[in-house]
A protein has these predicted regions:
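Gly/Ala-rich beta-loop-alpha elbow adjacent to hydrolase catalytic centers
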Residues: 73, 77, 81
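Conserved alpha/beta-hydrolase catalytic His-Asp/Glu region
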Residues: 126-180
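Conserved HGGG/HGGXW glycine-rich cap/lid loop of the alpha/beta-hydrolase fold
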Residues: 2-44
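Conserved serine/cysteine hydrolase catalytic core
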Residues: 166-206, 215
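Flexible "cap/lid" loop of the alpha/beta hydrolase fold
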Residues: 86, 92-123
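The conserved beta1-alpha1 loop
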Residues: 7-11, 74, 189
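Catalytic histidine-centered segment of alpha/beta-hydrolase-like enzymes
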Residues: 216-232
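Active-site loop/oxyanion-hole signature of alpha/beta-hydrolase fold enzymes
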Residues: 24, 33-72, 233
Length: 256
């Protein structure tokens, strides 16, 4: 098997920095590419005005790589990956959705809380504030060691698109996503994830009928920061498996 090109798509917040500990933990046959999307990590949002614009920026990164390619979407990164593949599912050989954000946006309490723009700004400032860091260390990043926890939280201050994501990702958007019947996929979740409930997996199975599921004991929401060695082992193994599944006879993807 050729080297698997693993494109890791970050969630809302600080951009690709959440994957900074991962390259050293991946085997030689899996190469990590972690682009920072427009509006995150200090990258200007520019004229991007929706999830489709983020997906277009991601597409440029993906098509520049040789095959086989696997997308790994974490949080809203999963939504951006789904948006991209909704029109071009053959761009990649597999998809890993790790605790994706996208479903139940009209019923979950956090997206509803952040409907007012002033609340979004207050939350963004609060997450990045050093004053509230002890609180977040007991909740959001409770398993992430120093100094990575502080770096991750501080990066929210530079997320120009943070608030806009709550306008762009809606229940209507999610309901309009097509089923991807031939795409090899894995839905990955941490057993101790306190940010997103694993019961949401069923909503993604509807979109990805070829998906399998994996729940990892001991993982919270950010295992790429809290335990990069274990995370690297798991995502590398999953990526290899998806590439093998994509090349199986009769899948319609073996010539991709």
């Amino acid at each position: 098997m050729s080297t698997v090109q693993l494109v890791a798509v970050h969630g809302n917040g600080g951009g690709a920095a959440r994957f900074a500990r991962l390259p050293a933990e991946l085997p030689h046959d899996v190469a990590l590419h972690a682009p920072t999307l427009p509006g995150f990590g200090g990258r200007p949002l520019g004229d991007v005005d929706g999830v489709a614009g983020l997906a277009a920026a991601l597409r440029e990164e993906v098509v520049a790589l040789p095959r086989p390619r696997v997308l790994l979407g974490h949080g809203i990164g999963g939504s951006v990956a789904l948006e991209l593949l909704s029109s071009e599912p053959d761009l990649v050989d597999g998809l890993v959705l790790h605790a994706p954000v996208g479903t139940r946006l009209d019923t979950r309490w956090f997206p509803r809380l952040l409907r007012p723009r002033w609340v979004r700004r207050a939350v963004q400032v609060g997450i990045s504030s050093p004053v509230l860091r002890p609180l977040w260390r007991r909740t959001i990043v409770r398993d992430v060691p120093a100094p990575f926890d502080a770096q991750f939280l501080a990066a929210y201050a530079d997320a120009e698109a943070f608030g806009a994501m709550f306008d762009w990702l809606t229940a209507t958007w999610f309901d309009g996503l097509p089923v991807l019947p031939d795409l090899p996929a894995t839905i990955l979740w941490g057993e101790d994830d306190r940010v997103l409930g694993a019961d949401q997996r069923a909503d993604y199975r509807r979109l990805l009928p070829r998906a399998d599921e994996r729940t990892v004991p001991g993982w919270g929401h950010f295992p790429m920061l809290s335990d990069p060695h274990a995370y690297g082992e798991v995502v590398a193994g999953v990526a290899r498996t998806l590439v093998r599944r994509a090349s199986e006879p009769g899948t319609g993807r073996e010539a991709s």
